[in-house]
């Protein structure tokens, strides 16, 4: 039965206090055994009772309060209210209210015209007492402008559902789940609240949290936490889909909880980390798109750490155990230190695998736990760990690391993996750890003695059969007596240490000297001491040459070659032809040779200065009439004063060099800089590529071919053939059946609509695009505009992966059609049936936000 509040005297005129009239309708419905209390369109002013727990309106068992829609029916607190009010609408304190709910209305706390502490919607029995409310439903409700919590279901409530609702511009949290059991939060939006968007807290368990959105909140987008009391952990929480972005602190914080899954969400633009877990057990972070976080300060995109509550209510320290981070696509911002960082604070048994990580400043993964494991995707890079001007303690990970100490007396430890350790200036202690490690020295000043002092480095665990010492930057010719450009090998009296020494001093009175723990006399030779660059030579054709961790010479010869230097201090020579040169990390020397060459820089770490050292690359033969410098992956906007995303063009006739400099440091203190041999004061955007080039087709069938640069190819309408060529390209075929070839580089194949690539089984139409050269672990398929959540069975927003009978073509299929019977589908040449994972895609989950437009 329906009870219209206007039949009980409510005015809804925005002036009259309608509290008693609405409550009378609620009481009548309850007395009759239940019913619907209906509030037509209008603004209903309400006020509280004598006690905070009296609320303004007390909802009762079997009663449902229903309005005419968000923004149409508004229940608003009266002006001048200055008392605490625990719920504008709430269940009665201590009554075990059941089977009730609210829908299709707005609750307005009138924060600008009141002074009391006010909550919007409140449920529950009595905090700390046995008993509960149960079977509570909230649908299409907006709560705004309350001074405390908007939706505040409290201790204890069983079987709560809140869906398609909105909380915004409230003083604290938008949505709270405080000791909820068996709750569902679905398709809700929380924005511009003073603290958290969503807060699952106080022993809540068995929570399903689906397709919710939190943005612009003062603290975290979503928090799952025990809270400030010594209670049982929150447990069994399933977070599926949704997005958490542009919040002041973390996108998602999972703290003092257990058995939590975060899957299929997009998390970006937050002030601190994208995801932080603290003091947890059995947490799974799976198949999310986490990108461009750490907007306020340097942070990893995903942080796994323990939690110290010894000064808190439990007086305990909670070590994080058994966290799984798999299948995520992680892209860093300018402040993102690592993709995934496990802190060295007792955290252990973290399992990391099959993630796609790019764009971070210090490395992909940092692990510290003794029993933690990492398995990378093909194409994953090494970890770069950079020290400071002070005395650093730098520890690597289980994967391959490049660790550079800088100045100071540093201690470097590679851990597992095939690592490169470069102590830099100062007296350093170097431990390679497991794996075949390289100890690099680039100047006599890295390790030396003088007539009055010793600043020699010490290698603590050199393995003559696996490790190597890179001396290519010093000019020594080999072993000998320490004279004539040679190094002498000698041991101390008890054989516990071996010394590599030169007895010829440099202009500053320094003699190169290096100490190795152990006796290596007679065991050092060209297999473990590298004095000269190894040469990797190309052919007369078009070669693709890639260096490794050592200092090498890459010589392309004739042909249009692609040279990538790797980790060492390399020499790249393009030779004749139109070549692409990318030195990678290290102090590289680049020579394009004849032809129109491209010098590519993809990371600030490729060429930089910091407060302690210079790692700038040098281009030896730049030709401004033909050559170009590709900076499109770095985010610089153009030439300027070297600040605010610009590069300063600076020339020195004295040194006959030109410099491109940025003076703003990244999160690790690095300032991008490259040097060119010669004075080029007229360099402009003709030679400097700051943005990705766009090649655009027509309504007809086009054939677009990229170059060596990073380009965006847009086919438009028609049956197009797109070939990205070299470079990291974006290919978008548009409508009709297109053929897409990325070429070399890390390419993105983008689809913006179902009709870009589809099959219609009803009328037999096939407009399926074909990707000819997809590379797992390097290329990506961008479906972010289509709303798919991941790979699956082809239903409920997933794509099925299917293989044709002869194993030559792989299909991605949506088994559900649009209104016209069109099924989205893509074809990939080759067998990828057992290779593809969510990490090969850019997914954005559907954000079902109810009627938030009415609530704005």
Swiss-Prot record:
Its main location: secreted. GO terms for molecular function: calcium ion binding; isomerase activity; poly(beta-D-mannuronate) lyase activity. The keyword Repeat applies. Hemolysin-type calcium-binding repeats lie at residues 387-402, 404-421, 422-439, 538-549, 554-563, 565-581, 582-599, 715-731, 733-749. PbH1 repeats lie at residues 133-155, 157-179, 180-202, 204-226, 234-256, 257-279, 280-304, 320-342. Keywords: Alginate biosynthesis, Calcium, Isomerase, Lyase, Repeat, Secreted. GO terms for cellular component: extracellular space. It is found in: Secreted. Composed of one catalytically active A module and three R modules. This is Alginate lyase 7. It comes from Azotobacter vinelandii.
